[in-house]
A protein has these predicted regions:
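PRY/SPRY (B30.2) beta-sandwich protein-interaction domains
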Residues: 1-198
């Protein structure tokens, strides 16, 4: 069963806006790469409107992953130019956006769940590792002018083995084909997530 339906549409990875070696599975919610040593990106299908948004990403295999947001206007040849991404090495990269990269000191690996909370009303993005806020991961509107652009999710991986590196849950309640273990609370009642939505 899926929560995604015509009256309740969730984001997926966008097969029309990706670099060439990205692999997709499970309704375009599992992302990986068949290549090694090249930067591979894919954006999400739906831009964030005015409101608060949350999604979860389970890391399922080594693959140099990073998760974040990118301006919706960019096509597959540009989505690496401006992006805000939390990388498995613990660094938040903000290439092309005029602020320095941020070292959080919090790495992640296979089995971890990385959540993203993006508040477009107040211009704040935060990352969580296994339901704990990542140190120094909060970026504000004054730094990146979130309110001046439309943004979509972005997934990055560089060293793939042909399997999914990231399994995203935008509200369907699944990581790949596995249901979330313990559905958290959600004030809007929209979607099923592993953890309580902050």
């Amino acid at each position: 069963n899926t929560e995604d339906c015509p009256s309740n549409v969730f984001v997926t990875a966008n097969p029309l806006n990706k670099t060439s070696n990205i692999l997709l599975a499970n309704g375009n919610c599992s992302v990986g790469t068949s290549n090694t040593g090249t930067d591979e990106y894919i954006s999400g299908t739906i831009a964030f409107g005015n409101g608060k948004y949350y999604w979860e990403n389970k890391i399922t295999s080594p693959g140099d992953p990073a998760i974040g947001i990118v301006p919706a206007e960019y096509n597959n040849n540009q989505i690496g130019n401006q992006r805000v991404m939390y990388h498995e090495n613990g660094t938040i990269y903000s290439d092309g956006l005029g602020i320095s990269s941020i070292s959080t000191g919090v790495t992640y690996t296979s089995g971890d769940i990385i959540s993203v909370a993006f508040d477009t009303e107040n211009g704040i993005i935060k990352w969580y590792k296994n339901n704990t806020l990542v140190n120094n991961s909060t970026i504000t509107n004054s730094q990146l002018e979130f309110s001046n652009k439309l943004w979509v999710p972005i997934f990055y991986c560089a060293n793939g083995n042909g399997t999914a590196t990231i399994q995203a849950n935008f509200g369907n309640g699944y990581f790949g084909t596995t249901a979330v273990a313990s559905a958290g609370t959600n004030a809007s009642g929209n979607g099923i997530f592993e953890y309580d939505v902050p």
